[in-house]
Amino acid sequence: MSGFDNFNTDFYQSSYSVDDQNQGGYGYSNTDEPYKPYGQYDYSQPMGYSAAPGMMQPQQPYTGQIYQPTPAFTPTSSQSMYSSSFEDEPPLLEELGINFDHIWQKTLTVLHPLKASDGSIMNETDLAGPMVFCLAFGATLLLTGKIQFGYVYGISAIGCLGMYCLLNLMSMTGVSFGCVASVLGYCLLPMIILSSFGVIFSLQGIMGIILTAAIIGWCSLSASKIFISALAMDGQQLLVAYPCALLYGVFALISVF
């Protein structure tokens, strides 16, 4: 054993001593604050670490119960949400563009051809009334044994297209196809009266011819009055009434024959 100790001493020639561990510390003996031996550090205040301000605050006490915790937010009931959304929605008839007040005013305007019409109301695209009047006209023809629904709708479409082209050429402001169809459809109301008389008596006599001519003049006068008031076509009523009379004359021929 003594030989082995001598061998280690001879082999490791160094000035390092075990007693210098607490003083040197692996080559850091020249620093201002050398490492301290184990057990001499103050662990209450760690060096180089500072906690975030929010992490060191005390926790808020839990105020809820075990089976009834305190909710983080109060959800809005579905009933109140749906009721508020339904109140904000417009009525269904308004979304469909059906206004019974305007329909009644347009009907009265047609029934009073000598009365001044409101151009702002007549300039609206309302097809609910014209569709009802077309169905009523076809129904009265059906009562006389004439199934003419196809002719009624076909002639109406062709007549609306022709009047649309003509009015756009004559007026300075222009007009939409829906407005033309609406006015011509409302002015079909006197023709329903003519076909209703055809259910009671024949329209092929002298009285029938006079009544038919009066109804054609009524329809064309109402339509031309509405067109010139809605499109500001002063002094052109006769020019507008002539093609309207041709259109309603075709409907009168269907009613008579």
Curated annotation (Swiss-Prot):
Transmembrane segments: 125-145, 147-167, 174-194, 197-217, 237-257
Stretches assigned to the Lumenal side: 146, 195-196
Source organism superkingdom: Eukaryota
Gene Ontology biological process terms from the UniProt entry: endoplasmic reticulum to Golgi vesicle-mediated transport; protein transport; regulation of ER to Golgi vesicle-mediated transport; vesicle fusion with Golgi apparatus
Major subcellular site: endoplasmic reticulum
Positions on the Cytoplasmic side per record topology: 1-124, 168-173, 218-236
Subcellular location field: Endoplasmic reticulum membrane; Golgi apparatus, cis-Golgi network membrane
Any matching Pfam family: Yip1
This protein's GO CC annotations: endoplasmic reticulum membrane; trans-Golgi network
Keywords: Endoplasmic reticulum, ER-Golgi transport, Golgi apparatus, Membrane, Protein transport, Transmembrane, Transmembrane helix, Transport
Mode of membrane association: Multi-pass membrane protein
Function: Plays a role in transport between endoplasmic reticulum and Golgi.
Protein family according to the UniProt entry: Belongs to the YIP1 family.
Protein name (database record): Protein YIPF5
Name of the gene: yipf5
